[in-house]
Amino acid sequence: GRRKFLTTGAAMYNASDPERGRSWFADCAAAKERGNELYIQIPCQPLSFDFTMANAYPFFSHSAFDGIKAYSPEQLMSVFKDPAFRDRFRENLRNPVVGTIFKGTWEQVFIGATVKEANRHWQNRTVGDVAAEQSIDPLDFMLDLALEEKLGTAFLGKFLNVGDEGVGELLRHEHGVVSLSDAGAHLIYMCDAGYGLHLLGKWVRELGVFTLQEG
């Protein structure tokens, strides 16, 4: 058959800016009409990060963390207690810079594993949910919990590609290629190696977005 030169890009669904992802796929369709085949790599899983506040990588794009990224746990604990730091972080969340993956969606930050037995009942719940239940600010709750556990609390943030309807729309797009496993990078934060089984289990079997043959 004839040789093809294909160009790919990567996109994810962002519930806070759903048109951005859609526009990229529309650009691909327009490129094909001009005779240029262009496809978007789209993951079928949420972009998820495991982290502790001892190495809060998902928050590093916020200027409140400038200058403290290499701090020791002891230094970080002192910073996280400071109301001025918390205010700066809140201001960052109110006015996020372009490219920031976390914009204050606390309902997408889960308490993965606690250090103290007394806090185990919060595991697998979101920071937003627990904070609302206690009528406190979610940022304060997260930092206070982390401080109580000497920054050992494990959190799980699901920051992009969240929302079945929006993600499913992009997965089904003719210019989408389900892929983008990040299994070889950022291993201390994330591993998407199981994306193939996730596609079959969720998007084929559970939701029926794809037939088995398509999957």
Question: Can you describe what each PLM-predicted range is?
Answer:
Residues G1-G208:
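Active-site neighborhoods of metal-dependent hydrolases
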